[in-house]
Amino acid sequence: MEGFLGFNHNHCFIVLFFVSLSLAQYEHWPYLPGYPEPPPQVYQPPRRPADVPKIQLRLAGQKRKHNEGRVEVFYNGEWGTVCDDDFSIHAAHVICRELGYVEAVSWLPSSKYGKGEGKIWMDNVHCNGKEATLAACTSNGWGVTDCKHTEDVGVVCSEKRIPGFKFDNSLLNQIENMNIQVEDIRIRPILATYRKRVPVTEGYVEVKDEGTWKQICDKHWTMKNSRVVCGMFGFPSERKYNTKVYKMFASRRKQHYWAYSMDCTGNEAHISSCKLGNHLNVDTEKNATCDNGMPAVASCVPGRAFAPSSHSGFRKAFRQEQPLVRLKGGANTGEGRVEVLKNGEWGTVCDDNWNLVSASVVCRELGFGSAKEAITGARLGQGMGPIHLNEIDCTGFEKSLTDCKFNMESQGCNHEEDAAVRCNVPAMGFQNQLRLVGGRNPYEGRVEVLAERNGTLRWGTVCSQGWSTVEAMVVCRQLGLGFASHAFQETWYWHGDVSADSVVMSGVKCSGTEMSLAHCRHDGADVSCPRGGGRFGAGVSCSETAPDLVLNAELVEQTAYLEDRPMFMLQCAQEENCLASSAVNTSVTSGYRRLLRFSSQIHNNGQSDFRPKNGRHAWVWHDCHRHYHSMEVFTHYDLLNLNGTKVAEGHKASFCLEDTECEADVQKQYECANFGEQGITVGCWDVYRHDIDCQWIDITDVPPGDYLFQVVINPNYEVAESDYSNNVMKCRSRYDGQRIWMYNSVHNGANQDGDTEERFSAYWKLGNSILFSR
């Protein structure tokens, strides 16, 4: 790690780079704190016609992002809504620009953000998209409508704010609880110890207003305000700070204060949901003053994954000792499908009433900040098993999602409604240490890292020896580009910078959960790469989506049985190496093999289709199955003793991938017959029945006893998936020489129940595993 972040004081450009890493929170700024700011951009809004009344807008309701919500209009002293009749994206653009956003992304009819109250001010709204205000668009007239609040319209605005946007405060004295509208917000480190720390956790809270950064007076500042600000920057909680030190700093220079204070309740995910507080006094130079006060300071507590340690540094994504909540299927740190542990079994959360407040409880529980987005509709993949929680209602101050009010019944919910979150995470500056070069688009290219060599920081390649999809996943995550779709060990077709051809990183081995490639195991300064860099440098291609294969563990348990099969019926299987090595000594005419048979059903619960690694030209024809196999290693079936040693061999070696069955609204795309395209569609599953050739483990040589039965899907990570942790299924098995019992199946990482052995007596008399002979 040190080799990638070091610098030499003799090189000023290296010092600047180190500062930029230290102040990673400001990586998107055009300048660094302490340096002269560029002249503020002044936004010139379109002029409002004199005959058009002044209005104020806000986004309200059950938000899932801070920049979306039900459109509400303040007119004639009262808040009201807008009907969705004749509404268009042009009207949405006008609304978003009036609120300070660059443009609208979409609009939603039929009270998608909940029903409003009071007046419906506008109906049959028609805009051309260039109006200065929504009030300048045509409509039926103020309050003239035949709509109900079930038709309240909502909009989704771009996250980009208009540079230099000026907040119109002309109606401020008429409106109570007006929401905050600012261009941007930051925590600017003041003390030297925080200026050199990653992430930045303490400093002045500043807002960008009319293109200029301004401090906030602390006279009405509360810890609730700090909690909201800390949450926005990826921190789960706030803490007290040394006010005396900051007073000393504040007295040394003149401050430029924002004209308002903030009034947050503490459960907001973004300051745009907070209310404007008191209006400050304004001096003769048009600068707000903070009598006997100083700039407000926020001091934040980072989650464990982001708190630097002298021993481990920043390591893997945050994991609790005994987590009750986890995120699955997300591409980046701090995002994924929400799953909760109940009665020893992981289950999902239904998205009914899912909003930013509840999502923020999940994020803070896992050591992140507030929620950036409350995701609905299984957009980060569908889970399997039970749906544990529904209609969650959090106050925002709960320590865990399980402390919130919720409905235990999941009637009417299915996995197409699985809730997910995207959390605010601290800016660590990791993306500044890595780049992709030479690709056809920003999502692919040769991997180049910034490393210190001989006291100089320079770009270089990564040795491709042993480079796999797992390492590529870390690269894509570090750059914020989603999942890896491919890992490349040759990149001659991507021409990078010749000066960066030298290998600066070798021996890279990742677990897949790291936030940065530098956190993976590697050779450090002792680089060794016989192949060299250049054309053999490691490369990746990234994708915003990925498949996710999950085995139906219950079906394996239910269908397992033993069969004594004559050798003369196994000649084809022996040719495909589906039997144990001792089978060569078994008589073809009188011998038999004892087979543990079962069915497997492999679901694709991800966001994109699972396609084989090899193209059609590399598929292999199998006479026994009468079709082509696209993957030689797709699934491993193993019988292990209790210490994990493999005791049985001989199982299905290669596979054809197809859509055997699909959910009701999903159409099959892949089939093995007639040299068809192979793969598994999202929402479909591939079934390997217990009665097909090689769908077994040869246990002829296995003595009676207790064992572990294991199925591993995509064992070599040849194809990228959004979640590899659910690719392994294990279950306990007991074999008495004539019968076998399968029980207590779990996916990798899940906890087995403590009373398994006590319950085993109930399984002992089950008859679905009795020996069959042919």
UniProtKB/Swiss-Prot annotation:
Keywords annotated in UniProt: Basement membrane, Calcium, Chromatin regulator, Chromosome, Copper, Disulfide bond, Endoplasmic reticulum, Extracellular matrix, Glycoprotein, LTQ, Metal-binding, Nucleus, Oxidoreductase, Repeat, Repressor, Secreted, Signal, TPQ, Transcription, Transcription regulation
Subcellular location field: Secreted, Extracellular space, Extracellular matrix, Basement membrane; Nucleus; Chromosome; Endoplasmic reticulum
Cross-link annotation Lysine tyrosylquinone (Lys-Tyr), location: K652-Y688
The UniProt record lists the keyword Endoplasmic reticulum: yes
Glycosylation sites: N287, N454, N643
Positions of post-translational 2',4',5'-topaquinone modification: Y688
GO molecular function: calcium ion binding; copper ion binding; protein-lysine 6-oxidase activity
Entry GO CC: basement membrane; chromatin; collagen-containing extracellular matrix; endoplasmic reticulum; extracellular space; membrane; nucleus
Positions of Ca(2+) binding: D548, L549, E721, D723, N726, N727
The protein's name: Lysyl oxidase homolog 2
Source organism per UniProt: Gallus gallus
Taxonomic placement: Eukaryota, Metazoa, Chordata, Craniata, Vertebrata
Gene encoding the protein: LOXL2
